[in-house]
A protein has these predicted regions:
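Conserved small-domain helix->loop->beta segment predominantly found in fold-type I
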Residues: 298-309, 313-376, 380-406, 442-452, ...
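Conserved PLP-enzyme active-site core in the AAT-like
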Residues: 2-42, 55-64, 69, 78-102, ...
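Short beta-strand-to-loop capping motifs
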Residues: 277-278, 355-358, 414-416
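PLP-dependent enzyme catalytic core of the Aspartate aminotransferase-like
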Residues: 393-482
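C-terminal, active-site-flanking charged/polar segments
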Residues: 22-29, 66, 373-380, 432-434
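Short, solvent-exposed beta-strand edge segments and adjacent coil->beta transition regions
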Residues: 272, 350, 407-411
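Short, conserved charged micro-motifs
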Residues: 284, 362-370, 417-426
Length: 482
């Protein structure tokens, strides 16, 4: 954000936008919240928004759209094939991401499906800085496997390391030599690594990854869903790039990759997704898969109106005052929570503020899902919906044994230009109260566990009457307050 100093020295994020269309919210009583979270199987994904006050589940598809995006939707050229809206999007992709060939898809996981079908063979490995849930599911579904090669410090939750999303270059080369270059389907780098706290990689690291990829003739794929935020943090934290524009930084990152894919629900504050490249042979390997899985090549299963909004949103990603808004609010939340003793992932990343649930609920065994329990407890006492990013979001091995997550986090997402400062302060206040009463939180156990992506549809029971005890303490401290 553009720096604005306050007279009395306060350091608070300043919104450089005004609110013109609003949606009414409801803060229901804790008794209703108890019914809602129990009906949801203590899974915040299963909550209905009518029972949610602040929806901090995700930034995917929930970013505020600009007036220019909404206006662009009215010029949509509704055509099954050859829509002019597609060509406007194609130009935006070339202008912003520097890629000539575009395949539209309905969202990010659809891009993952197409890429996995085109380039991954059974038994091959995909090397990545860190997995994302849906990407891992697609790789496993195709009979592949993943190797995650973060640096050792990346999983130190509280540190000053500005680029925890970096790939360990020594581990990368060792992995290629161990597996054999022909058995590596591709190398994947995820911008603003989601599951470890929205942590970025540096351009220097991406250059090193590119060098190794070239040495062994392996394709480099970039998940650019959170590219704008990664570029912003590069500008803030990487000395060599502090004087460069957002456009310079984003183009440098995409130019280093053979293939770029993204969820427009994040990157451009719209809905949809895309795969783009400058290599025609890669485009042709994927081309037939888009009509098969998504829709014709000029709409890819996306509403034409959303294609128009996507094009405008891509250009707006280059606006530093827009892209910095969410990271600024996250930084404020993390720093204020830290002052209150609440364990948070540092340095502050993107997507959201990440609570270290493993430390917050260190009395809850990891096999009883401390991050999921914290998410349920936080909703119960606040009406705020966060997302579990821990062992519930993990998988079981081929023998049905739980694979414990590397970290147990509760993510409180900050979609772009959605929440106000007073709402942020409310979320902080309730989190502080819960931390002071954290020993009341207990564990969870599955009673319905789907075999794939269980964190979406799974349902759990509490392991004791801890939710009732938490509600009693809330009423004692807050009286009749919502």
């Amino acid at each position: 954000m553009t720096e604005v100093k306050f007279y009395k020295g306060e350091s608070i994020p300043l919104e450089l936008h005004k609110v013109r269309v609003v949606q009414k919210l409801h803060l229901v009583p804790i008794e209703r919240r108890m019914e809602a979270i129990r009906d949801a199987g203590f899974n915040t994904f299963q909550l209905s928004t009518k029972d949610v006050f602040l929806d901090m589940l995700t930034d995917s598809g929930t970013n505020a759209m600009s007036d220019n995006q909404v206006a662009a939707m009215f010029q949509a050229d509704d055509a099954y094939a050859g829509s002019q809206s597609f060509f406007r999007l194609q130009k935006a992709i070339e202008d912003v991401l520097g890629k000539k060939y575009l395949l539209p898809v309905h969202q990010g996981r659809a891009a993952e499906n197409v890429i996995a079908n085109a380039f991954l063979q059974k038994g091959q490995v995909v090397i990545t800085n860190y997995h994302f849930t849906t990407f891992l599911a697609h790789v496993l579904d195709k009979g592949g496997r993943i190797e995650e090669l973060l640096t050792d410090e990346a999983l130190v939750l509280r540190s000053n390391n500005p680029f925890k999303g970096n790939m360990d270059i020594e581990k990368l080369e060792a992995s290629i030599n161990r597996n054999g270059p022909g058995n590596v389907a591709f190398i994947r780098m995820e911008a603003s690594t989601n599951l470890i706290g929205g942590q970025p990689f540096s351009i220097a690291n991406l250059m090193d990854v590119r060098r190794i990829a070239d040495k062994y003739g392996i394709m480099l794929v970039l998940d650019a869903s959170l590219l704008g935020e990664n570029a912003y943090l590069v500008k803030q934290r990487e000395e060599a790039w502090k004087e460069n524009t957002m456009e310079d930084i984003m183009k440098m990152m995409t130019n280093l990759a053979d293939l770029v894919y993204f969820s427009a629900r994040k990157l451009s504050s719209s809905r949809g997704g895309g795969i783009c490249t400058n290599r025609k042979e890669l485009y042709l390997k994927m081309e037939a898969l888009v009509p098969l899985y998504e829709g014709f090549l000029t709409y890819g299963g996306i509403s034409i109106r959303e294609i128009e909004a996507m094009a405008v949103g891509l250009y707006e990603t280059l606006d530093e005052t827009m892209i910095s808004q969410s990271p600024a609010f996250i930084k404020y939340f993390v720093e204020e929570a830290g002052k209150r003793g609440i364990p948070m992932v540092t340095p502050p990343g993107v997507l959201g503020a990440h609570v270290d649930a493993g430390t917050f609920c260190d009395h809850v065994p990891q096999t009883e899902y401390p991050a999921g329990a914290l998410g349920a407890a936080y909703y119960l006492i606040s009406g705020v919906r966060g997302m579990e990013r821990g062992t519930i979001s993990s998988v079981r091995d081929e023998n049905g044994v739980e694979i414990l997550a590397d970290v147990e986090l509760l993510r409180l997402a900050f979609p772009r230009r959605v929440f106000t400062l007073s709402q942020t302060q409310y979320a902080l206040d309730r989190l502080e109260w819960l931390y002071d009463n954290r020993k009341l939180i207990g564990g969870l156990k599955f009673y319905y566990e789907p075999p794939v992506l269980r964190f979406f549809m799974g349902k759990l029971n509490e392991t004791s009457d801890w939710p009732e005890k938490l509600m009693v303490k809330f009423r004692k401290d807050f009286g009749k307050s919502l």
